[in-house]
Structures are given as structure tokens and as C-alpha cells.
UniProtKB/Swiss-Prot annotation:
One of its GO terms (cellular component) is nucleoid. Keywords: DNA damage, DNA recombination, DNA repair, DNA replication, DNA-binding, Plasmid. PROSITE patterns: SSB. Homotetramer. One of its GO terms (molecular function) is single-stranded DNA binding. HAMAP family: SSB. This is Single-stranded DNA-binding protein 2.
């Protein structure tokens, strides 16, 4: 059997601005993100460090889009798995325009990394027992969340937790 090809993109980067969320006529959510990935290197001749940042357009569909709109904020680090897709349209002057986007839908993955701006803005500050959205992994529209964040809300503990910050539920 002949292979038809592979179209898979994996990115780890930082959100450039808060997600823009729209809803389609059928009620499905669509979130548009800009994601920055950077690489640094040292120039041999003078030892100077250089950096190049690449900006990616990411379009997230369904439940993933709703989660992105609730938890992702400018500066947040995120892991994205999706597919490349190029769209064509005609602008007002009749010129054909193209844009290439990373599409994240049912087969894609979005995982929020780190702590930076991972709490929704409308929630008040809570004790650091469970960082909202941190480490939340979502694969496709079928799983809303994985890990302890998927459980029902719990009452905050009477005493503050120790200062260490790790998750014993990590499967590796």
C-alpha cells in the first residue's frame, strides 16, 4: 500500500496575543492564535549571540478553542500538534492572497506549559494548590482535560501547602 503522506506540525512557543474566539453558525468555537518560536545561536567569528523568532498562525477548533479562550493569555507557553493548511482568498483589489496556518482540530493536541499567565483573568487569586490550566493536555474534542484538573472543584485546604511545586500524578 502506498503512503499518502504525513502532514503533522509540532510547535512549542509563546502566545503573541490573547486568543480571538468566534463561533460558527453550528455553534462550534474557532480560536485564532499567534505563536512565537525562537532559536538562538552564537556567531563563530565574533561570539555574539543571535536570535530568530518565527511567528505562526494557529487555528484551533471545537472544545480546544473554548479551552484556549479560557486559559491561554499573551505570553503563555503552549505545545501544539496540528496540520499545515494553506488558504487562498482574493483581496479587495482582486489580488490572490495566501496564508499558511497550523490547524488544530479533533486529531490535534494542545498542552499548556509553565505557569506564565495560565490563570483565567476573571478568576480571583487562589492558593497554589492547583494551578488552573497548568499542564492541562487536550487531545481532540473528546477529552476536556487530563489529570487532576478534570475532577470536581475542591475546597481550599485549611493550611497552606509546602513550597515545593511538582505533580505526583505525572505518568513517567
Amino acid at each position: 500500500m502506498a503512503a499518502r503522506g504525513v502532514n503533522k506540525v509540532i510547535l512549542v512557543g509563546h502566545i503573541g496575543q490573547d486568543p480571538e474566539v468566534r463561533y460558527m453558525p453550528n455553534g462550534g468555537a474557532v480560536a485564532n492564535l499567534t505563536l512565537a518560536t525562537s532559536e538562538t545561536w552564537r556567531v563563530r567569528q565574533d561570539g555574539e549571540m543571535r536570535e530568530h523568532t518565527e511567528w505562526h498562525r494557529v487555528v484551533v477548533f471545537g472544545k480546544l478553542a473554548e479551552i484556549a479562550s479560557e486559559y491561554l493569555r499573551k505570553g503563555a507557553q503552549v505545545y501544539i500538534e496540528g496540520q499545515l493548511r494553506t488558504r487562498k482568498w482574493t483581496d479587495q483589489s482582486g489580488q490572490d492572497k495566501y496564508t499558511t496556518e497550523v490547524i488544530v482540530n479533533v486529531g490535534g493536541t494542545m498542552q499548556m506549559l509553565g505557569r506564565h499567565n495560565s490563570q483565567p483573568q476573571q478568576e480571583p487569586q487562589t492558593p497554589p494548590t492547583a494551578a488552573k490550566g497548568e499542564g492541562k493536555a487536550v487531545k481532540g474534542a473528546g477529552n476536556a482535560a487530563k489529570g487532576k484538573n478534570a475532577a470536581a472543584p475542591q475546597q481550599p485546604p485549611a493550611q497552606p501547602d509546602p513550597a515545593y511545586d511538582f505533580d505526583d500524578d505525572i505518568p513517567f
